[in-house]
């Protein structure tokens, strides 16, 4: 992790097309993003929770009306049956959690059925059944669902970057977007985002 790169991404930004602003601040071990977007006759406000990995900020973006959202990363370990997890949620906004996802199959892809458990501070989650499915229209995007006793509790969208999966997730009644923010230089920020209900990646440029 580069402290300079991390510092460069913080602060106030504006969309290059002039239709919105973005503020990024660090809160403990995570990052809070606030968007204000103007679209035709509508004003939209979004929030985001992010983790900084390899000089990039990976964010879960969601409407201000959403009660809970999370951001995560899966990284293959061992014999490809297991993925380690790094995650954060708005329920513990300033703290990173860990986890482990295990499946029976051995392959280098992320698709499959997993048993997964998460840890944060003194809390252990119940064991979830995690299903990861590649989106048909885009080999780089994935749909994720977390179930307990065959009932889906959470859903999410994942994107592959540097052989790791970064994801945005939350309750099944709400929309989430996984966003990758990276500095082009000190005054330009590149954004790539994918909505949970979409199969395309949207590009945006922020400046200051």
Report the location of each language-model feature.
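Central antiparallel beta-sheet cores of small beta-barrel/beta-sandwich binding domains
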Residues: 2-208
